[in-house]
Swiss-Prot record:
Gene responsible for this protein: rpsQ
UniProt GO BP: translation
Functional note: One of the primary rRNA binding proteins, it binds specifically to the 5'-end of 16S ribosomal RNA.
TM helices/strands, residue ranges: none
UniProt GO MF annotations: rRNA binding; structural constituent of ribosome
Xref: NCBIfam families: PRK05610.1 (NF004123), uS17_bact (TIGR03635)
Organism: Acidovorax ebreus (strain TPSY)
Pfam families in the record: Ribosomal_S17 (PF00366)
Protein's recorded name: Small ribosomal subunit protein uS17
Similarity field: Belongs to the universal ribosomal protein uS17 family.
Quaternary organization: Part of the 30S ribosomal subunit.
Amino acid sequence: MTEAKKSLKRTLVGKVVSDKRAKTVTVLVERRVKHPIYDKIMIKSSKYHAHDENGEYKMGDTIEITESRPLSKTKNWVATRLVQKAGLL
């Protein structure tokens, strides 16, 4: 009975909006929700601080973050992988 355990940690995908702090990136995660009365699709967003040990993620990159133990007062997420590199303007 060697079954692979499913990870209980949440993963989210978002866009890096700030990389000014050492070893930390701020990630904006957007989600779509339907209004319960008016049935309109709304976009809600949340910002998360994620740990970036090597400073490899830059502003505009789309990355995946995974829930972890508290690393500081506001940092409970770790940047795990790059989904899409930021394009040139």
